[in-house]
Every structure is written in C-alpha cells, then in structure tokens.
C-alpha cells in the first residue's frame, strides 16, 4: 500500500467527499439556473482565486460568488450564520474550528505561502540583516492583526523564532509592532488597491511583514517599495486550509475538487503560492 502524508490524507478525504476525481462532474454549461457557489476566502488569495474561478465559470457555466477578507473575521461571520458553502482560509485553525463545532468538513491544505518583508526605500535590509533591521528603534514595523488575520499569527510566530536567534527579540518586537491591517476597524484602502502597498505608501510603517504573495503585489503597485526574503531560521510556513459544508451540493464539491486539480494548482503557483 502506498504511504500517504497527513496532508495527502486530507486531500484524499476531500476528494472522497467530492465523490472522487473520476465520478464528480462539473455542472453543465447549460445549467444556468444553478445557484452560485458561495465562497469565503482569505484576502491573500484574491488574484489567484479570481483567475481560477473565472476559468471555471467559462468552462462549466457554474457561477462562483467570491467574498474576501481576513480569515478570522470570515470565520466569525460563518459562525453567526452567514451561508457560504466553501471556506478557503490562510490557515487551518479557523476552518478546523468550524469543523469542530459541527457542520463542516475537516480542512485540507490546498496551497502554501510564506512571509516576506515589504520595506520602504529608506530601509536597506537584506535577509541576513532583516532581524537587526526589525529590532532597530528607528524602524516602524507593521503587521496584520493576530487572531483576526492569520498573517498576524504567522508574524508573531516569526517573532518567537527570532527569540531563539537573539535573546529578548520577541519582547521587543511584540511591544513595537503596529497592528495596521486585518482587524474589523483597520483602515481600508480604496477598492482594488493592495492594503499593504497603500499603508506603506501612506508612510504608516517602514517595514511590513506579510505574505510573500501580498508583498509582490504591493511592490508592483508601489515600485519604490522593496521585497526582502525572510531568512530560513525565521521563516514560518503558511498552510492554507480548505473546507466545505457537510452534505454540500454537487456544484460545491465539484468546485472544491477543481481547486485541488492540476490546472488550478498551476494558477496558484503562477501567483507565487507553493504546492500543498
């Protein structure tokens, strides 16, 4: 028997729920009366998931309704009764909480990400000097808000790793880092603009720790910004969890299956994500 990793087992379980790859059929293009598949997804998935959904709609005729936001806030909305059928989170904790409460499938990791530092043109940092840069008293560090946005949780996990590299680093970073995004009351950029590029362009921070995919988008919008890779000893892997409601309709399970299939995974890779 072929040995399977826990991630592979999770993916196999999701495919089994969908009826397996050879048995579940995508909705026919003629079925225009089928209700849209309601998807709640982490904001960092926006570009890639928009592309995947657009292609899926063109191939199948099935409409996909996408709502983006910080994963923790989306999970709270689902707990309060909002009716999305599929949840793509930037972590596995929030979908697991839904599954533990009942009514949702156990999450499966479908893509991965990592953290990068988005820096202003005034900051001269490299991977080797990044920690010293973050600890400088004259450098303002920005982050998303922990618990509301997994990016913030991953950032604080990076700070814990930093403490093993330089004693006392966690306390200093914990006290100085500005929680500028990801909360319900965080400032909102104009529509269609990266919140991280916008915050940096507004001068709210000198360094912003965010997903590498987010940092690349922000740097394209604000070219004077720089993207600095986090060194291996500080890097925190971000595993994105996918879950859908138990008893989901064939249209929902078919789209969930499509997210795991090679064409969609190729799109995610093109946008900077890595394989599960």
Label each PLM-derived region with a short phrase:
Residues 13-14:
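Residue-level signal for mature regions of secreted extracellular proteins and peptides
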Residues 17-19:
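C-terminal motif of bacterial Sec signal peptides marking the signal peptidase cleavage site
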Residues 102-108:
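Central helical "cap/lid" subdomain
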Residues 21-67, 71-72, 76-80, 91-92, ...:
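Exported/periplasmic ABC-transporter solute-binding proteins
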Residues 8-9, 106, 231-233:
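Residues embedded in well-ordered secondary-structure elements
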